[in-house]
A protein has these predicted regions:
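Generic, well-ordered alpha-helical segments
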Residues: 26, 54-62, 73, 77, ...
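Anion-binding and metal-coordination hotspots
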Residues: 7-8, 67, 74-87, 98-553
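Basic, short loop/linker segments at the boundary and entry of helix-turn-helix/winged-helix-like folds
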Residues: 26-68, 441
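Secretory-pathway/luminal and periplasmic proteins that interact with or process carbohydrate-rich
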Residues: 91-96
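A ubiquitous short alpha-helical element
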Residues: 3, 50-54, 458-461
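Hydrophobic alpha-helical membrane-insertion signals
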Residues: 1-32
């Protein structure tokens, strides 16, 4: 029988000369591109977070590389990163054989939570310098991501206000029952006013003094009266504590309608994932992102459930990040409001933003309602509408409305004449008297402008791209990257965690669209100019306004 010869296998052999750690890593591996990219980031503000005294900390560059590479590979657990630093060659290469534990990794993330946004901005500017994005267009969309908090930790504003009102009446009734002179005087003073914890504390102190200065009870009835007073005093103190609790709930909530006890920054919202199909609300955040070529160029977290109230502040955050507004904004009908259209008009943005019923209007079989105000003939010069029967609807007044965001809208009211006996009345309207319509002319103007933009050749192109821009990024985020729920408590930590994710997401996509040689060539050409460019944007330097305008052009 022929002898089989195997390759030499001595797994415990010693090597005379140490080998390079990256010997077995491919030249075009994403870990090399990440390594080169982080080496060229400006981390001066991160270095300032460390104290010169004490034990030498791990290098921030190494920590940043390790965490970003973990996020690129769907690894978000610090314990898992600690484990991979001991056995994964890519992590060992980035760490240079350093092995920080999970506590150190988590502390680093918390340490840089205020500076990670600057690092995200630098990475986006590298993408712009590479020509992968232009920062001239924003494809905007939002999604709700569940918080780490439990879904049964809710506090509802309406419930708190209702119980607080009941408590006020209970306190007023209790004060009337106290037969002490001081309590009666205070009850008279507080008749019809709202009680506060400070006022109840003052009343309790006076009642305590009254009980202490009272003579020693001798008879059975006197002792019973003292016990009753003490019981009432104890009840008053309990109600004071409850009032403090309600006031604290309302202070934490602010303008919101709810919050979570374990994550006060989270608001209860309806999520898309509803396994029970009962419309149950869960604590979460409204995540807004802007994309271009499926790169995340901006992001922000909001407590508002609706996207309409977030657009203007989100566009402002883009300006604060890059010192200029985007030239073009593309969004769905959830953002089409008068306030948002006005904001984009003031700042000279092309608003490819849909409004309600836009898709319905574009259907081939769509026929507009002949009785709706939008279908009626309007004489702009004399300011009147004409109903389907030819009757003039004259202007009768102006209605002022205030949105939940504090924006003031004005609607003009028009009233028809002689609606009694009209053969079309049953189809036109069913209220008594003559028909009254309300028309917001400014909103109608912006809708017409948006309709012209959206149905143009450029608008059709943007509408087609919007479906594959933020929607695709959300799909990759939730399903390919398994980033369906935040893993931290508090808005600042949640913002930090998503900033790490967004940086890793952009670098991963960059790796698929470029190679290491191209990146190094760009880095060598732009090393001097680009570092100054980055310094200006993240606030290290303070140049004049003309220099900003030149960079933003």
């Amino acid at each position: 029988m022929t002898k089989v010869h195997f390759r030499s296998y001595i797994h415990k052999k010693m090597i005379l000369f140490p080998q390079r750690i990256d010997k077995d890593i491919a030249e075009d591996d994403p870990v090399r591109l990440l390594d080169a990219l982080v080496d060229n980031l400006m981390l001066d503000n991160v270095y300032k977070l460390y104290k010169p005294s004490g034990r030498k900390p791990y290098h921030p560059q190494m920590m940043l590389k390790v965490i970003l590479y973990a996020y690129m590979n769907n690894i978000y657990s610090c314990r898992r990163i600690e484990s991979l630093l001991k056995r994964d060659i890519h992590f060992i290469y980035l760490a240079g054989y350093e092995q920080p534990d999970f506590i150190t990794i988590n502390r680093f993330r918390n340490r840089v939570k205020k500076e990670i946004n600057n690092i995200f901005t630098q990475v986006v500017l590298i993408l712009a310098a590479k020509g992968l994005i232009s920062l001239d267009v924003e494809y905007i969309d939002g999604t709700k991501i569940e918080s780490k908090a439990n879904k049964y930790t809710f506090v509802w504003k309406r419930t708190v206000e209702k119980n607080r009102a009941k408590l006020q009446e209970q306190i007023r009734t209790l004060l009337l029952q106290v037969d002490d002179v001081i309590a009666q005087d205070n009850a008279a003073k507080t008749e019809g006013i709202e009680f506060t914890a400070a006022l109840l504390d003052e009343i309790s102190k006076e009642l305590n003094k009254s009980l202490e200065s009272a003579p020693e009870p001798k008879t059975k009835e006197e002792k019973q009266a003292v016990r009753t007073k003490k019981k009432q005093l104890k009840e008053l103190e309990n109600k004071r504590n409850k009032l403090q609790e309600y006031d604290q709930h309302l202070e934490i909530m602010g303008e919101r309608n709810s919050y979570s006890k374990t994550d006060p920054d989270a608001t209860f919202m309806h999520m898309k994932e509803d396994a029970m199909r009962n419309g149950q609300t869960k604590p979460g955040y409204n995540l807004q992102i802007a994309t271009e070529n499926q790169f995340i160029t901006n992001f922000a977290l909001y407590a508002n459930r609706t996207d309409t109230l977030t657009l203007s502040s989100f566009l402002e955050s883009f300006k604060s990040r890059y010192h200029r507004y985007a030239k073009t904004v593309v969004a769905d009908s959830g953002y089409g409001s008068e306030e948002n259209y006005l904001f984009m008009d003031i700042h000279n943005m092309e608003a490819y933003v849909k409004y309600n019923y836009f898709h319905k209007e574009q259907r081939p079989r769509y026929t507009p309602n002949p009785f709706s105000p939008a279908s009626l003939y309007y004489n702009k010069e004399q300011d009147f509408y004409v109903c389907p029967m030819g009757q003039h609807m004259k202007r009768i007044g102006l209605k002022r409305s205030l949105t939940s965001n504090g924006f003031v809208t004005y609607s003009v009211r028009y009233q028809a004449e002689r609606c009694d006996g009209c053969p079309l009345r049953g189809s036109c309207f069913k209220a008594r008297g003559n028909r009254i319509i309300e028309v917001n002319h400014q909103l109608q103007h912006y809708k017409q402008k948006a309709r012209e933009l959206l149905t143009s050749e450029e608008g059709i192109k943007h509408r087609g791209r919007r479906c594959i821009e933020p929607e695709a990024v959300f799909g990759q985020t939730k399903y390919n990257k398994a980033y369906k729920r935040f893993r931290h408590f508090g808005k600042d930590k949640v913002n930090m965690d998503f900033a790490f994710f967004a940086i890793a997401f952009n670098i991963g996509k960059m790796c698929r669209k470029t190679n290491l040689k191209e990146l190094k060539a760009v880095m060598e050409l732009l090393l001097v100019t680009f570092r100054c460019f980055i310094q200006v944007y993240i606030g290290y330097l303070k140049p004049n306004k003309s220099f900003y305008m030149k960079l933003a052009a």
